[in-house]
Amino acid sequence: MVNDHQKIKNKFSIWWVRKDLRLNYNLTLEKALQNSKQIIPIFTCENKLNTNININSKSYAFLYYGLKELEKSIEKYSGKLIITNSDIHSITKYIQTKFEIKSLYVQNDIEDNFINDIKQLKNHINVELVNNNLVDAQTLLNNSNKPFKVFSRFAKKFKENYKSCDFAENTVFKFAKTAIQNDNLPIPKNTFGEFTPGENEANKRFQNFKQNKIFTYHLDRDYLYKDSTSKLSPYLKYGMISVRKIYSECIKLMNQSKGVEKWIDEILWREFYIYISIHFPDSIKYEFQEKYRKFPWEKNSNYLTKWQEGETGYPIIDACMKQLKETGWMHNRGRMIVASFLTKDLFIDWREGENWFMKQLIDGDTASNIGGWQWTAGVGVDAAPYFRIFNPVLQSKKYDPKAKFITKWLPKLKNIPVKYIHEPWLSENKIYIDKLIDHQISKNKTLQNFKSFNNHNE
């Protein structure tokens, strides 16, 4: 506890650290510093940023060690990151008894628990919500002054209006060193794999991608066996790198390669889903397209478990699901393939897949995850049409032609001829588990079900 029994009289502000685990290019921190003499940084473990994170997950390990990195960075400036199991209201009220607190600064968010916390905080402290995203959802509107619902129009308007973004720069850090005892976080029971947490690592990855991969990104990005993507998503999820800074750097390279433009579009898809969740908050829980909120998905716990464990009999699906469980990450092309398989081959509710992904992914972001699942299922904003159904065999042959990716995650298929790896059921010998379903039969059923539903709900 604080040793001083008297309130320290000075103008302090609280930086509530949530999804911005970095010092540099952090608008929340910059605004706090502009209006305060010293900053008291706090991280509350009570909700662990979202309810799906558990101590066994790679996401928790990534967060835990990411906090350690931030803690060390703050200590270099003679400050202390308060890490507490208390809720934000209790710790804020306690600090207010010891310091003259001017305001609490925090990055804005869409999570329900965050919105409720802010409402309560405003009863006893001035709260400053800061937008660290690329897009200001309230000002980027169409010609009718309404929110965009089509990605291409959203992206076009954004690029026309934002050739760069404001981001904090050359900040002088001034942190308060409190005597508040930190609570001990549970030590992770898992590792963070290939994703080393922290701001320094995030910046190294970005610079490496920008120098070596971004110019061919449009050519290589879909191939599952190639290491051609930035793999910055975990760092963006926890704010270990500024999306404004990377956009501002990449937009300068826009005319040099289609790869740069394509990668910027992927960043903007992330922003688009956040934007949609702000303007249409119901879409976080329900289908964006309201007519599909009564769609008759099927329940099949056996199929769901087989999909989760990577035991569907389709090697491309199984390899992707093994990768997810082992690493906490999956290639974006893989995510679309397995999502299509769950919703349109197994006919299982997209929410089951979305929930499983959030439990497994290091980069599990609410808006992007829900947006991506609804897009593939054909029920979301600017979604793929219901009749777009990924053929797992064709996807396998196109994006992993020599089965390098598949055999990495399913090594028992290593010595099998490639044509049988993509379609093991064609072999006279039993070289792999039986497939759960026949894709063509499932596809026909899905098309019929969607057509029938649409005819009755126009």
Where are these regions (language model features)?
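Residues at alpha-helix caps and immediate loop-helix transition turns in enzyme cores, especially N-
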Residues: 24-28, 116-118, 353
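Active-site-proximal binding-pocket segments
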Residues: 11, 227-410
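Short catalytic-loop micro-motif centered on adjacent basic/acidic residues
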Residues: 15-16, 80-83, 103-107
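Beta-rich, aromatic/charged-enriched effector core domains that present basic-aromatic interfaces
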Residues: 87-197, 373-376, 393
